[in-house]
Design a protein with these regions (language model features):
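Predominantly flavin-linked oxidoreductase catalytic cores and closely associated redox partners
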Residues: 120-258
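N-terminal FAD cofactor-binding segment of flavoenzymes
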Residues: 48-84
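FAD/FMN-dependent oxidoreductases across multiple families
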Residues: 75, 236-317, 329-333
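C-terminal helical "tail/cap" subdomain of flavin- and related membrane-associated enzymes
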Residues: 319-378
Length: 378
């Protein structure tokens, strides 16, 4: 950290958000540009539960590139040996990870995973501020961003940064304040319930099952837990009143496979609604800033690409930032172009996958997935 006048901290790069994308930027910068002063500002203490995710085996090279592969293995996340899906028909089909190049995947404890990445960045010299929010970004005449940072105990200080990374997730709070517009491609929500497993829940596969008004997801969690979600559009979620536990379980009992996995389990909470819509920013870079991870673009959970995309995005962003500090702005242009191409490819894959399910032609949920994508600016 570089100090300046009273109550002002100076950094080359200020990263707003300490999730996988923000941490990946920091870790990669420490590797490729160790002279840069870098700070992460994270709103949480990494102590609240976070929705889990199945991490594909292909993440191994990214974690190794960031220098955290051994630390990741030491966390002992639950193994995931593949995915089972009932999609386009009632019969389950399996995709076994173990036959691929990198073997098994993992059911992530996201809280521990995110905290591990941030801790590794801090150990490498990144300043980590937790329970801290950033407000009032201002760009004064000297070209540096000025940020006001507040902790949860109401202490505040100012930060001067030559470059800002928006890693604030779907909110994209910094980028949107700079005029970037969020373009929505659907209104997908997840109604999530955490459950305590029964003794019969022994398989470690992620289970995906299509239903008339959406689709179901379930995966194991540490400590004999399981997370399950009913995924549908916001208007359908409201119509079915899925925040009501009884209504959620009524829908779950209409499934063919998910109910057999969940009925032995005991719910630990009422359904929680979380945004899962696909979106992108109309631009992911600007004057001395860029957006990474879900702040730049977010994929449908069906892709199982959330954390993988976040890490890859963070690494690519770090290359663009390194070029910027060498006086070369073309890296930011390349980053913008790569992001656009990646999202175009995702939309094609998304359309192909949803197009495989044709059992409910009169369902609004499936009709929307089979129609041409209509862009919506938020």
């Amino acid at each position: 950290m570089l100090t300046g006048e009273d109550n002002l901290r100076r950094y080359d790069v200020a990263i707003l958000g300490g999730g996988p994308a923000g941490a990946a930027v920091a870790l990669s910068l420490r590797k490729h540009a160790p002279s840069l002063a870098v700070a992460i500002f994270e709103s949480s203490n990494y102590d609240e539960p976070r929705i889990g995710e199945t991490l594909p085996p292909t993440v191994q090279p990214l974690l190794a590139q960031l220098g955290v592969w051994e630390s990741f293995l030491a966390e002992n996340h639950l193994p995931a040996y593949g995915t089972q899906s009932a999609w386009g028909g009632d019969e389950l089909e399996s995709n076994e990870f173990i036959y691929g190049k990198f073997g098994r995947g993992w059911h992530l404890d996201r809280r521990r995973f995110d905290a591990m990445l941030a801790r590794e960045a801090e150990m490498r010299g990144v300043d980590l501020f937790t329970a801290s929010t950033v407000a009032k970004p201002q760009k004064p005449h000297d070209g540096r961003w000025r940020l006001t940072v507040r902790s949860k105990d109401n202490q505040s200080f100012s930060v001067a940064a030559n470059f800002v990374v928006d890693a604030t997730g779907k909110r994209a709070s910094f980028a949107t304040r700079q005029g970037a517009q969020k373009i929505l491609f659907d209104q997908l929500l997840g109604a999530f319930v955490f459950l305590k497993c029964g003794a019969t829940t022994a398989d470690s596969c992620t289970l995906v099952e299509a239903a008339e008004d959406g689709w179901w997801y379930s995966a194991l969690l540490p400590g004999s837990g399981i997370v399950a979600a009913w995924m549908s559009d916001a208007d359908i979620v409201r119509r079915h009143r899925l925040k009501d536990a009884n209504r959620w379980f009524e829908q779950m009992q209409k499934t063919v496979h998910t109910k057999h996995r969940l009925l032995p389990a005991e719910p630990l909470n009422k359904p929680e609604l979380h945004a899962a819509y696909s979106h992108r920013l109309d631009r992911v870079t600007g004057d001395r800033w860029l957006a990474v991870g879900d702040a730049a673009m977010a994929f449908d959970p069906l892709s199982s690409q959330g954390v993988f995309k976040a890490l890859r995005s963070g690494i690519l962003a770090s290359y663009a930032i390194c070029d910027f500090f060498k006086g070369d702005s073309s890296g930011l242009e390349k980053y913008q172009s790569l992001a656009a191409r990646e999202f175009d490819g995702y939309l094609k894959t998304r359309a192909e996958f949803y197009g495989q399910e044709r059992r409910w032609p009169d369902s609004p949920f499936w009709q929307r997935r089979h129609e041409q994508v209509v862009l919506q600016k938020e």
